[in-house]
Structure formats: C-alpha cells, structure tokens
A protein has these predicted regions:
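Short N-terminal strand-loop motif that marks the start
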Residues: 1-65, 121, 212, 319-323, ...
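NAD(P)H dinucleotide-binding glycine-rich loop of Rossmann-like/cofactor-binding domains
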Residues: 33, 90-167, 202
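Adenosine-nucleotide cofactor-binding segment
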Residues: 166-169, 181-240, 244
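N-terminal Rossmann-fold NAD(P) dinucleotide-binding loop
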Residues: 173-174
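Glycine-rich phosphate-binding loop and adjacent beta-alpha segment
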Residues: 102-104, 183, 194, 201, ...
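Glycine-rich beta-strand-centered segment in the early N-terminal region that forms part
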Residues: 22-37, 50-94, 110-112, 125, ...
Length: 335
C-alpha cells in the first residue's frame, strides 16, 4: 500500500510517498481503506518537528480520516466489513474525562496516523459517517468539528439567544459558527479578511470584525453586545489573543481555549475578578463524537471544504494550510 511518511527528519520536504506492507487487524481492531484525510494545524506542527522534536521517525501523519472497513479482527462485533467510518482522534477515549493514558492514543502523533491507503484502528476508534456526507466531508469531523462541539455544546452548554465570538475562519471556527447557529445563538466572527467575513456572514454569522482594521476588536465585540460582552468565546489564537477574549466575554462568561496559534503574556487576574470560566478543550471522546453526528445528520450540517489535494501533493496541502489563506478545511484525497 502507499503511505505518506515523515522520513529522515522534520520539515515539509521530508514528507515522502512510500510503499508499506498491507496491515492486518489484531484482536479488537479493524482495517480501514482510507479515502480521504483532512489537515489540522497540529499536523503542520508534527511534520515540522514543532509538536514533538523527539518523535521517533518514520511516522505517518494526520489524525482525521474517513473510509471503508476492509477487515475486522477477532472479537469485533460493533463494526462490519463495508461500513463507512471516520477515525476518532484519540483511539483510547471512548467516554468519560480526558487523562494521560488517553493522550498516548492520539493518531498522527504518539502513533501512526491516517495518511495511508490502509490503516489499522481500534474498533472503538471508528464511528459511522453521519447522514449522506462524502468521505471528504466526513474526514473534517474527528478533530475540527468535535473540538467545536466539545467547546460550545458539551462544555459551554450554549443556549438559544446567547452570543458566541468565533475567531477566524478555519475548520474549528466554522464548525463553531454552524453549531452555535444550530442551537439558536448569535455569532460574531473575527478575521483579517473582509471577503472571509462576508462568507462567514453568508453562513449565518450576525456580525464580522476585521481585526486588522480594528486592532481593539474586543472593544468592538463589547459594543456589538450592548456593552455586556459575549456569553462564549471560541479561542483559537492562544495566549496572544486570550487577553482580548477575556475583555470581550461577559462577566461570568465562558471561554473555550482551543488554539496555540499565537504567543504572548497573559494576565490571569480578570478571570478571577470577573468570574470567567476558562476551559481547555482537547478534541473529545467517542461518546461526544456520536452525539455530534446525530445532530449533524438531523440538521443536515455540511462541512466547509476549501480545497482538496491528491495524496501525492500532501506536502503542498500542508504548505497551503500554513499560508492561512483557506476558508474551512483542507483535505487530502487518498483512495
């Protein structure tokens, strides 16, 4: 089978198309013929050595895949050959809370990922593709969609009539927009691009703020909410934007901390003085994934895909992701 490996060192020029033996499932495992994989910022960090510079190589990158079950191992009864499935980011997180053991089961980091024609996964580490989503659409769900769902729904308990600030127009942010609207919330989006803001508003955002034109975007968000601040912030920027997010959220509000895109100093005092709940979100469990998929199927949610690359151009796909010009998800077609 063909696979993409990080081979001989880190960097996009070390992503190589190689041949590997076809894998066989062990007890409790399945083999999935992968049709597509979607890219996350984490995948870029892994490939360039910034995620874990001591990671053993070679390594197959990427956590988010979708395909067809080709073989099942001994003891597998929940999945059958021919099922259309998506991978779970954490192969060992079925339900309950996150722990260190779960962290060791992350695809495309601690263990080989999904950027290959055939991949062995735990039977508990795949979920049925919801509704009539294509493989390309389904591959956007395991990390980006589930992270947004966890942050807003499972942790944030977003309700109709509340307000949500979404930073940027990447995969997590657009899913957050969709899930917030699904629950009847008002959405404010920030971006450096007026064109992307127009697209986000066409998807249901009520307001857009260009943070290049309005560096004090937190003050503008407060103005848009009548001087109160938003109920929820989907914080993808990291410590470099967190301070402004704290100023943009209402007293007693909720911030889902997801991203690490920027660095900077952060004063924790406003969290205490304004009773703001800051929750770190690291994807989610299979149980959360299944709940999200039921909502996606019921409400007909369609993922936003910016561009699809062939497997041979995986390095170009990651380079495109790095350029930050995308609106939604970047996908690699495998089979």
């Amino acid at each position: 089978m063909r696979a993409i490996e990080i081979l001989g060192g880190f960097g996009l020029d070390h992503l190589k198309l190689v041949d590997r033996p076809d894998p066989a499932p062990g007890p409790g495992q399945v083999v999935v013929a992968m049709k597509a994989a979607s890219l996350n910022y984490r995948d870029l960090l892994v490939a360039t050595g910034k995620y874990n510079p001591k990671m053993p190589l070679p390594r197959i990158p990427c956590s988010d895949g979708a395909g067809v079950v080709e073989a099942v191992g001994e003891g597998v009864s929940t999945v059958k050959v021919g099922d259309r499935v998506a991978s779970t980011f954490f192969q060992g997180w079925v339900s309950g809370g996150y722990n260190e053991a779960v962290g060791k089961t992350a695809l495309g980091g601690a263990i080989d990922g999904v950027l290959a024609e055939r991949v062995v996964l735990e039977a508990d580490g795949v979920v049925p593709i919801p509704g009539d989503l294509s493989f390309e659409e389904a591959t956007t769900l395991p990390c980006a969609a589930l992270t947004a769902w966890h942050g807003l729904v499972e942790s944030g308990h977003v309700k109709a009539g509340e307000s949500v600030l979404v930073q940027g127009t990447g995969g997590v942010s657009l899913f957050a927009l969709q899930f917030a609207r699904l629950h009847g919330a008002r959405v404010i989006v920030t971006s450096s691009s007026d064109e992307k803001l127009r697209k986000a508003m066409a998807m249901g955002a009520s307001d857009g703020v260009n943070y290049k034109d309005t560096p004090d975007w937190d003050k503008r968000v407060v103005e848009l909410t009548g001087g109160v601040g938003v109920d929820h912030v989907v914080e993808v920027g990291g410590s470099g934007t967190l301070g402004r997010s704290v100023q943009a959220v209402r007293a007693g509000g909720h911030i889902a901390l997801i991203g690490v895109l920027t660095q900077g100093d952060f004063d924790t005092r406003p969290l205490l003085m304004r009773s703001i709940r800051l929750q770190g979100i690291y994807v989610g469990s299979r149980t959360m994934f299944e709940a999200m998929n039921r909502a996606i199927a019921l409400h007909g949610v369609r993922p936003t895909i910016d561009r699809v690359f062939p497997m041979e151009q995986a390095a170009d796909a990651l380079g495109y992701l790095e350029s930050a010009g995308h609106f939604g998800k970047v996908v690699v077609r495998i089979g």
